[in-house]
């Protein structure tokens, strides 16, 4: 073969090799392109990297907030005397004869009152040194120091709306409020409201002399309740009403109590008759028509010395009142039965049984048996009243 032909063959061989290399490069590029396009069309769930997976949010479980508030209430506390009474047998003299001083009056019930969350009473006296009396049959007073007896007795609030708060006119009224404020005892009634938080729950305490059913008074009562309900408060009203020595409420008491509950009140507590009256359940709320006397300096030896401590255990779920527990603790206004020593004392044995039996007889609209154990009323239940 000529040198010329050999060169041509060698050249053709180089061309063929180059063409083959070009072909291989094209095939490789095509495969890479196909793989890239295929990867771009993968579904999201084909990505197996769990770190990039967005999981749905799980809401934390919300626990209900449950709260209980224990309220105690007692009746007429006339911590004073009338100047016409025999001083030797009077309430002030009794404490002076004891080593307990001002702690004497509530020493036999303090074990109960100190274990609740709040205790209220009807304060039916004045704390004043004024001698300018109102023109009436009885005028009760004690010096301002006697307000200490309330604090020592674990009483946090008092109703001052009654027929003895002005026994020594406006001066006596103002002196009484000043004495209470000095001892940090809250008061309500006669234009004052007591609003407070107890264990985070809102409470409003109101007091009135409840002998009137005229429109002006009812409108005022309705407005006072409405203002408290705007703050989701439990509304507790004290009414000084009824007839003395009457064991059953008169029609006006029932009408006023029902009106108050119809407009949002939760518990109604009554006093003035100086004896106990029945308890009523109305629209899943509670009315105690008369708590009777308690620490009562208005009589050195009343024939009926029975009384009781009214207690209500209020249960809340998420700041809403869901049930009202009711019980009574039978007491006597005196630690002895032959006179009034002005020292309320728990009853036991037959005396306790007899008081509970009598109170149930008087409470024909209670809807449950009243005892010293709590009975709970569901406030959210549809009422049949």
PLM regions: where:
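N-terminal Lys/Arg-rich, disordered targeting/topogenic segments
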Residues: 1-17
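Electropositive, gly/pro-rich neighborhoods at or near active sites that engage anionic ligands
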Residues: 26
């Amino acid at each position: 073969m000529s040198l010329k032909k050999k060169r041509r063959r060698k050249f053709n061989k180089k061309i063929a090799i180059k063409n083959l290399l070009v072909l291989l490069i094209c095939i490789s590029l095509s495969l890479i392109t196909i793989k890239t396009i295929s990867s771009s069309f993968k579904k999201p769930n084909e990505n197996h990297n769990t770190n990039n997976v967005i999981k749905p949010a799980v809401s934390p479980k919300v626990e209900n907030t449950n709260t209980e508030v224990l309220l105690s209430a007692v009746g007429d506390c006339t911590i004073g005397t009338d100047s016409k009474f025999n001083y030797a047998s009077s309430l002030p003299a009794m404490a002076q004869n004891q080593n307990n001083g001002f702690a004497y009056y509530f020493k036999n019930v303090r074990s109960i009152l100190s274990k609740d969350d709040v205790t209220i009473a009807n304060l039916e006296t004045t704390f004043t040194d004024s001698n300018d009396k109102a023109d009436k049959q009885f005028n009760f007073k004690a010096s301002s120091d006697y307000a200490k007896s309330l604090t020592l007795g674990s009483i946090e609030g008092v109703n001052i709306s009654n027929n003895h708060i002005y026994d020594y006119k406006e001066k006596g009224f103002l002196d009484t409020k000043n004495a209470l404020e000095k001892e940090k005892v809250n008061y309500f009634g006669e234009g004052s409201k007591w609003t407070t938080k107890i264990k985070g729950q809102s409470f409003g305490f109101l007091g009135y002399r409840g002998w009137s059913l005229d429109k002006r008074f009812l409108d005022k009562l309705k407005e006072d309740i409405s203002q408290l309900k705007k703050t989701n408060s439990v509304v507790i009203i004290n009414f000084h009403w009824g007839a003395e020595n009457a064991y059953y409420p008169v029609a006006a008491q029932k009408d006023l109590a029902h009106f108050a509950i119809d407009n949002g009140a939760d518990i109604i507590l009554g006093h003035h008759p100086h004896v106990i009256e029945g308890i009523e359940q109305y629209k899943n709320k509670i009315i105690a028509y008369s708590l009777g006397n308690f620490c009562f300096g208005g009589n050195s030896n009343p024939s009926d010395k029975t009384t009781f401590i009214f207690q209500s255990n209020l249960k809340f779920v998420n700041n809403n009142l869901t049930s009202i527990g009711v019980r009574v603790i039978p007491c006597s206004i005196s630690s002895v039965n032959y006179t009034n020593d002005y020292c309320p004392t728990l009853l036991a044995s037959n005396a306790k049984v007899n008081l509970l039996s009598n109170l149930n007889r008087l409470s024909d609209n209670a809807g449950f048996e009243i005892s010293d154990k709590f009975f709970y009323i569901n406030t959210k239940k549809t009422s049949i009243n």
